[in-house]
């Protein structure tokens, strides 16, 4: 590549219920090392005055901004009007809008906002034309983390993201845009699981495959083939019991994303699965990235995995399998048609079921949930039945969940019962063999909150 470094942007999302409070939080985290701000708009009645309050004292050219949540297209219009009003140089504006009717709309709601999404894509094409001179504004974000957090495999997540991205290209070119105009306005968001080397390879394969897709349309400039990747550490493998282990998961996942060469990264706070993240958890999440940058110097080496036989081979293997699945989706008419036919949702549900079985049989380990639980831990009041109960999908939609939920639901039921079930460990025979079985049994019962009395 042409990069002389491996710098990424430290991203953190602020929930915007009250613009004034959100602005105060944003200013605080900007002074704590964040250089990529996400704003999740909670109200559909968000106004220009609200935007002025939200961005008060924030130097727009100095930070990457991302807007998601309610009425993102309307928010985009407000943001563009503000930029023009303030006369900010177009090359200094770095903003992404999480407009995503294909994945966030179709895949999680089951349908578009209009028949076949015509109004959605016409609006997107209009915004792209308005931002044509803004080189660093991305209008569409392909929300691939939804696949990973719903239980897909790494190959499936990559293939479905590429397929959705290609569908955007086709629809936007049908709306009169060139390949360069469409491709430069796309941004891709992925989840990052604990599968360390596989995740590094996934990001490397993603850039390679996306470049192949865009090159197929013969763009005038190769820069249109570049893929801007945002990564979020996984929510699927987080646990509500022994939650501090989530810090360790977030650290290895952040390392994978950094070594994989992402543009921006958000580490999920360790308590996000059972409460609104605290100031402490959000600070730790930021500091994971800052430590990787300033103490481990992960931002100083370009593609450190390059030349590694294992990772290079893994990259090629993932790319080959993802491309095979991508072509299968294309044969079905592309992402939209394949999704409406149930192919994508059923494929993810099958992968999720296989993962659930592996967790249930401890072929896949989730520390603190199905292996090595904290024997003395009792669920706090912040852990509710809702936080450990998996929502059932209705129809052809994707519903994110966490892999540990089945174990956690069982253990929470025991914790809330007011009783302390006990199991007496009666060991006999050879001491070494008995001890091994005793340790296994202690772990087994503790996963359900059953106290073991060892003789």
What are these model-derived regions, one by one?
Residues 98-102, 142-149, 182-193, 224-236, ...:
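A glycine-rich phosphate-binding loop feature that marks nucleotide/adenosyl-phosphate handling sites
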Residues 152-158, 193-205, 234-247, 275-285, ...:
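Short glycine/threonine-rich loop-to-helix capping motif typified by GTGT followed
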Residues 1-195, 217, 226-230, 258, ...:
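Catalytic alpha/beta active-site cores
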Residues 33, 87, 210, 260, ...:
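Conserved, mostly hydrophobic/aromatic
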Residues 1, 263, 321-423:
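Intrinsic disorder at enzyme termini
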Residues 86, 175-180, 214-221, 299-303, ...:
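Inter-helical turn/loop segments and adjacent helix faces that build the functional surface
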Residues 132-171, 251-326:
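Mobile "lid/hinge" segments at catalytic clefts and subdomain interfaces of large enzymes
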Residues 189-285:
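Glycine-rich anion/phosphate-binding loop at the beta-strand->alpha-helix junction
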């Amino acid at each position: 590549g042409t990069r002389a470094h491996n710098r990424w942007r430290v991203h953190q999302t602020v929930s915007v219920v009250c613009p004034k409070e959100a602005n105060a939080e944003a200013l605080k985290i900007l002074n704590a090392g964040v250089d990529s701000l996400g704003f999740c708009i909670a109200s559909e009645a968000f106004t220009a005055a609200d935007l002025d309050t939200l961005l008060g004292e924030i130097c727009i050219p100095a930070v990457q901004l991302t807007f998601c949540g309610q009425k993102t297209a309307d928010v985009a219009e407000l943001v563009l009007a503000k930029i023009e009003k303030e006369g900010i140089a177009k090359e200094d504006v770095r903003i992404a809008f999480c407009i995503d009717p294909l994945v966030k709309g179709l895949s999680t709601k089951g349908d578009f906002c209009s028949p076949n999404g015509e109004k959605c894509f016409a609006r997107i094409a209009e915004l792209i034309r308005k931002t044509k001179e803004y080189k660093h504004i991305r209008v569409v974000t392909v929300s691939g983390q939804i696949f990973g957090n719903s239980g897909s495999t790494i190959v499936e997540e990559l293939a479905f993201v590429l397929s959705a991205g290609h569908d955007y290209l086709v629809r936007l070119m049908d709306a009169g845009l060139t390949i360069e105009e469409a491709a430069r306005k796309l941004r891709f968001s992925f989840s990052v699981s604990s599968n360390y080397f596989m995740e590094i390879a996934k990001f490397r394969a993603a850039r390679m495959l996306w470049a192949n897709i865009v090159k197929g349309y013969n763009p005038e400039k190769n820069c249109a083939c570049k893929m801007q990747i945002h990564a979020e550490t996984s929510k699927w493998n987080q646990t509500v019991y022994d939650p501090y282990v989530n810090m360790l998961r977030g650290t290895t996942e952040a390392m994978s994303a950094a070594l994989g060469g992402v543009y921006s990264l958000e580490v999920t706070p360790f308590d996000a699965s059972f409460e609104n993240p605290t100031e402490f958890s959000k600070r730790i999440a930021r500091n994971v990235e800052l430590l990787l940058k300033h103490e481990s110097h992960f931002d100083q080496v370009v593609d450190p995995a390059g030349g590694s036989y294992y990772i290079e081979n893994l990259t090629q293997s993932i790319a080959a399998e993802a491309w095979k699945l991508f072509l299968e989706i294309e044969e079905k008419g592309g992402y939209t048609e394949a999704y409406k036919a149930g192919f994508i949702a059923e494929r993810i549900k099958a992968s999720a079921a296989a993962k659930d079985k592996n967790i249930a049989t401890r072929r896949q380990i989730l520390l603190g949930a199905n292996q090595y639980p904290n024997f003395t831990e009792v669920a706090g009041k912040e852990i509710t039945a809702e936080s450990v109960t998996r929502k059932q999908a209705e129809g052809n939609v994707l519903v994110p969940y966490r892999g540990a939920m089945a174990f956690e639901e069982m253990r929470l039921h025991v914790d809330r019962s007011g009783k302390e079930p006990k199991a007496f460990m009666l060991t006999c025979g050879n001491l070494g063999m008995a001890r091994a079985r005793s340790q296994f049994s202690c772990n087994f019962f503790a996963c359900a909150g059953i106290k073991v009395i060892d003789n």
